[in-house]
Regions:
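Active-site-proximal, structured, solvent-exposed surfaces of multi-pass membrane proteins
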Residues: 531-532, 712-815
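Extracytoplasmic/lumenal acceptor-recognition loop(s) of multi-pass membrane glycoenzymes
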Residues: 180, 364, 372-376, 400-471, ...
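Short acidic, glycine/proline-enriched helix-loop-strand junctions
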Residues: 480-512
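A glycine-centered loop/beta-turn motif at secondary-structure junctions
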Residues: 653-710
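An acidic, glycine-rich "communication" segment
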Residues: 601-662
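Membrane-proximal, lumen/periplasm-facing interface regions of secretory-pathway glyco-
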Residues: 366-397, 411-413, 505-509, 533-536, ...
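Short alpha-beta junction capping motif
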Residues: 565-604, 677-679
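Membrane-embedded transmembrane-helix bundle of lipid-linked glycan/lipid transferases
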Residues: 1-381, 390-393, 472, 486, ...
Length: 826
């Protein structure tokens, strides 16, 4: 007992030392996402003080966001609790969080060590676990606090999986289920990674031990039910249209050469933001595979397979698998290390000299990463650091003049810290951007703002800031290649839209527009774009309205006939003939319709991209287009940019009047022209995308001719005052004008007392008082899933308990028979 108390005391001391060193480090809270989690915890803490146990909506980020819906809520509650323990100080709460995670993670290993009769080794692993280089990376570089919380119970999960599979201990099944539920509610994506790692372990188990597969089936069922038990939250999280990235490109970033994962000096030469498996850990894994007893070998093999899967040579293989977008293999490193350490813990035949050497290597491997904890030790406080950031980026001044919402275009270079500074609980203002964009209903809107900044579509950028309700804007300028010309273009575009430059420094320009305190926007567009890639034309021609729905059957003739031009690219339909009839009717009555042939859907009946009597056929160009013979003259467009030299596009058959053609292999290929009448225009060769990439003036003139639009024209916008009040479960909006864009993002938890309409992911209301009530999304469906999962879980536990009891009786019977036989022999 005294030994246990001593170990617990040592763990507590280590945790306090960690808290102290971090508090004096001068760089805390570090980590790209840390401030995002601190912000959420602080918002929840304030809500809890006001009696709101589950904030449905936070208006401060992304024009309003459901912060508890798309990111697992357990870490948010945990951080709110830590903030309460710190007396309401969110940064003190962060230190408490680190201390608790360090302490509880260590305690998990100690409990496991005691259970296996190896309390000293378990205590050492517990003291080491938080300081493993990859775990420190997650906490202090990535700022992934939810994953850090998962690390607390991961060893217990591995222990119970091993116990159920190898020891056939029934009580381990409920425990591993509960561990998995906890991890799912901490970080659903990471729980999925743990489940995939478990599949590897199960495969190794099946090959090594050749036992009944029923135990594996039970564990996998427990994992599946663990996911489903969280259905009351998980169903709504998956149902609400959460935006995802180009997953294959993101996935590629989480593979690296094997030697990079094993280079212990890389952290000293390239910084600490590198994934490191650990040379010592790899030596342990290889040593275990070669010399460990069969009972403790499975974890070593699992760790080795995971390590191999982190290498770049495996990317081309894994990317072909279904669900590969979730295989961010470098994120699996801590899981692999946990399996390896657990196998070492239960390897009770290993000679002490070897064990001591391995432990020394593991400890030495952590030393370079410890700087992540103690930093510069200059004692700079978070408040001082944030104040310096706010002054250097002009955020402080921008907040002081913001009436409604502030837009900071930083391309995430400042991480979540800038988002916290803008909307901090003390003196924050509402922001167009935020942190954790995957939870934003306006994810597409802000993505286009970033893209327009990168592509120098400044007129579009400032105009859409107005649409999003931003009266103040901060734009970085230090990365401009041609400072004089670029800054002049930026200022001119801002002035055209109505912004005035208030201040500037070497890094940022600050713009502001005089507006009513709280305002909405009434807008008239000349044109409308429909389809997944229609926004490209909007960036080049800001007077083209973006839309949310790509389905032509969602629109009416009356709705589209109000526009001078309708642009279609990447559109869909449910009823092809109805869509074609509507488009043809529009053109016959004076509306110009321009269709990008590359974005025409494939006809399911013919397997060909066809629409309104035309069909499109694939063609590839290398490096650049051939000579383009058009009604505007012969064009010689710019070459394709680097990375786009293999240009996959289409040409068009069936045009009545060909306005543009190119010759390829002695064949004339139409890429531009009309069908049926001069208002129905088709464009091929993916010229819109080419223009977005190159800004080729020749192509721009062609597109302007086709669209009959001026690239410098803006939509007609009128700012109108609104009275907006946010409550715990409702938003009250008072407007004196009809069809007002409130600049509040649209969510499926909204129900209005009078009709509300979504346009481009933003809420539009009518004249009068609109009360939008909010309710927990998909409560009945989610609760039903959790209830069914709970019943099935109990059934699984009961069935496995009966199986265990039967096996126990059989074992007791065998033992009793042996004892009787021995007595008879005597």
């Amino acid at each position: 007992m005294l030994g246990c108390l001593l170990v617990i005391g040592i763990y507590a001391a280590i945790s306090f030392v960690v808290m102290y060193l971090v508090s004096r480090s001068g760089v805390y809270p570090s980590g790209s996402d840390t401030m995002c989690h601190i912000y959420k915890g602080s918002v929840l803490y304030q809500a809890l003080k006001n009696g709101n146990w589950y904030p449905l909506f936070d208006p401060m980020w992304y024009n309003g966001v459901e912060m508890m819906r798309y990111w697992a809520p357990m870490p948010v509650y945990f951080l709110a609790m830590c903030q309460a323990l710190a007396g309401g100080d969110c940064f003190g709460g962060y230190l408490v969080f680190l201390g608790i995670v360090s302490f509880l993670g260590a305690l998990s290993w100690f409990v496991i060590g005691r259970r296996h009769g190896r309390p000293v080794l378990g205590a050492i692993f517990g003291a080491l676990w938080f300081f493993m280089p990859n775990n420190l990376l997650a906490v202090f570089v990535e700022g992934n606090l939810p994953r850090a919380l998962c690390m607390v119970v991961l060893p217990l999960f591995v222990e119970n999986v091993h116990d159920y599979l190898l020891e056939q201990r029934w009580s381990s099944l409920p425990k591993l289920t509960l561990c998995f539920v906890f991890m799912t509610m901490c970080h659903t994506g990471y729980a999925g990674m743990i489940a995939l790692a478990l599949l590897i372990f199960a495969a190794v188990y099946a090959i090594l031990y050749r036992k009944s597969l029923w135990s594996i089936v039970h564990v996998l069922l427990a994992i599946i039910l663990g996911f489903l038990l969280t259905g009351i939250w998980l169903y709504a999280s998956l149902k609400g249209g959460i935006t995802s990235t180009d997953s294959s490109q993101v996935m590629r970033q989480f593979f690296q050469e094997a030697w990079l994962s094993l280079d212990p000096l890389r952290r000293l030469t390239q910084g600490f933001d590198v994934f490191y498996f650990g040379l010592a850990a790899f030596i342990l894994v290889i040593f275990g595979i070669l010399f460990a007893k069969k009972r403790s070998m499975a974890g070593f093999w699992t760790a080795f397979i995971i390590f191999i899967c982190t290498t770049t040579m495996m990317y081309d293989v894994l990317v072909l698998l279904p669900g590969s977008q979730y295989l961010w293999m470098l994120r699996f490193i801590s899981i692999a290390l946990c399996f390896a350490l657990y196998s070492l813990l239960i390897w009770n035949t290993l000679k002490k000299p070897f064990l001591v050497v391995i432990l020394l290597l593991l400890v030495l491997d952590t030393v370079p990463s410890l700087q992540l904890i103690y930093g510069t030790m200059d004692g700079t406080t978070p408040a001082q650091r944030l104040e310096q950031l706010e002054e250097g980026t002009l955020i402080a001044e921008a907040k002081s003049i913001t009436s409604q919402r502030l837009a900071l275009i930083d391309l995430s270079t400042l991480g979540a810290t800038a988002a916290y500074c803008i909307s901090d609980p003390e003196d924050g203002v509402m922001a167009t951007f935020g942190a954790g964009w995957q939870s934003a209903a306006t994810a597409m809107n802000i993505s286009r703002l970033n893209e327009s900044y990168e592509n120098m579509n400044y007129l579009y950028m400032f105009d859409r800031m107005v649409e999003l309700g931003s009266d103040t804007a901060l734009v970085p300028v230090s990365n401009f290649t041609n400072q004089t010309d670029d800054l002049l273009q930026l200022d001119e575009a801002a002035k055209r839209v109505g912004y005035e430059r208030i201040d500037s420094n070497e890094g940022y320009y600050l713009y502001h527009m005089d507006t009513p305190g709280s305002f909405g926007v009434c807008t008239t567009y000349d044109a409308i774009g429909i389809g997944t890639s229609a926004s490209l034309i909007s960036m080049a021609f800001p007077s083209v309205e973006e839309t949310s729905s790509t389905n032509l059957n969602d629109y009416t003739y009356e709705e589209l006939s109000r526009y001078h031009t309708v642009y279609l690219s990447g559109f869909t339909y449910d009823q092809k003939k109805e869509a074609e009839d509507m488009i043809l009717k529009l053109t016959e009555n004076g509306t110009r319709v321009v269709i990008l042939a590359d974005g025409i859907p494939v006809d399911t009946a013919t397997g060909i991209q066809s629409f309104l009597g035309t069909d499109s056929h694939n063609i590839n160009f290398k490096n650049g287009y051939p000579e383009l013979d058009t009604i505007d003259g012969v064009l010689h467009p710019d070459l394709f940019p680097s990375g786009y030299t293999d240009w996959k596009t289409v040409y068009i058959n069936g045009l009545d009047d060909v306005w543009g053609a190119a010759t390829d292999l002695d064949q004339s290929l139409g890429f531009y022209g009309t069908k049926y009448n001069e208002n129905l225009i088709f464009i091929g060769f993916n010229l819109t995308y080419h223009y977005a990439l190159t800004k080729d003036q020749q192509v721009g003139v062609l597109l302007a001719h086709a669209l009959d639009l001026d690239a410098n024209a803006l939509p007609e916008r009128t700012l109108v005052p609104l009275d907006v009040t946010y409550g715990a479960d409702r938003i009250t909006i008072v407007s004196d004008t009809d069809d007002v864009n409130t600049t509040i993002s649209d969510h499926d938890i909204f129900t209005g007392n009078q009709p509300i309409e979504e346009k481009n992911h933003l809420i539009h209301v009518s004249k009068g008082t609109t009360v939008i009530t909010m309710s927990y999304p998909y409560l009945k469906e989610g609760a039903l899933i959790s209830l069914i999962a709970a019943i099935l879980t109990v059934c699984l536990w009961a069935a496995t308990w009966k199986r265990a009891q039967k096996r126990k009786k059989e074992t007791e019977s065998i033992i009793k028979n042996r004892e009787n036989n021995n007595l008879n022999r005597r």
